[in-house]
């Protein structure tokens, strides 16, 4: 059992999605960036490769006293706009999602965190590195809000978002999502095979 799963030499950052029904407003993820850190006192070489084919960016000076902030951009442009990290909720099985995300490689173990702001809210997701590789996964989520309590002015139930983001690390890999009978939800989730 590995107890330090967040530190790794390789991190796979899959695409994320915006909330369904939030094309405008304060829930759009802006100020998106990767935050890289390490316990190493020596300089670590890190390469960040966008999965859309853009040129990689290499840093030679990551250390415990010098974390790196890699700016991704904003999804706000008079409404939701996809970035290299966030894809539209209606394109999670399309070209946007296939070309989004990042591969982060370092010559020494590092931490990689996704951070973003959305209006008065903020979010962060921590990569699990090589410890997250595998072929079988389970996920559980809590329900968000109540459709019976929602009102017209602030329909939290329709804008809350729980999702799973999966990324194949080898070409021509088939990713299948099997939903058990116990699943509870308002929206049908589709299986995407690439």
Annotate each PLM feature.
Residues 1-2:
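Bacterial N-terminal signal peptides
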Residues 5-194:
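Intrinsically disordered, low-complexity linker/terminal regions across diverse proteins
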